[in-house]
């Protein structure tokens, strides 16, 4: 029961705007720039520690831009089928917004096949779709995706 209450509390008080986000000033300033210009590159947010605000930062940025947003928790959904079905369908769909943003939380849980498939999709849909990846274990991410 305590775990459910902690989850509820964390979601209730999760920052929703860049002004509410407290933590890394460098990230906050970069995000403010992205929001002002409505520009975004693919991002990899990582820190060895859990609970440092990676997911909150990703959601704040994505929801502050003119974008359709898809969120996937890769610790639950991490197969190549997720990439080929859900992600490709979303990335290839039409949108009236400037961007489509796909947040892949806990990306290091993606299988190697899923990471390889995603890498080619990041290139294929780079004109309209941006990927924000969060992870704790940067060493599990292939160099091709890090670059």
Predicted regions and their residues:
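P-loop/Walker A NTP-binding region and its immediately flanking N-terminal helices
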Residues: 1-147
């Amino acid at each position: 029961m305590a775990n459910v209450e902690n989850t509820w509390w964390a979601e209730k008080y999760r920052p929703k705007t860049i002004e509410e986000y407290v933590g890394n000033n460098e990230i906050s300033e970069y995000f403010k720039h992205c929001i002002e210009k409505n520009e975004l590159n693919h991002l990899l947010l990582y820190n060895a520690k859990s609970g440092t605000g990676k997911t909150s930062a990703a959601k704040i940025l994505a929801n502050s831009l003119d974008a359709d947003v898809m969120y996937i928790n890769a610790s639950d959904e991490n197969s190549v089928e997720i990439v080929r079905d859900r992600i490709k369908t979303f990335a290839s769909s039409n949108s009236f917004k400037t961007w489509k943003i796909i947040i892949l939380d806990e990306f290091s849980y993606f299988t190697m096949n899923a990471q390889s498939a995603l890498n080619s999709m990041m290139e294929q849909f780079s004109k309209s779709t941006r990927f924000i990846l969060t992870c704790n274990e940067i060493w599990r991410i292939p160099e091709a995706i890090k670059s």
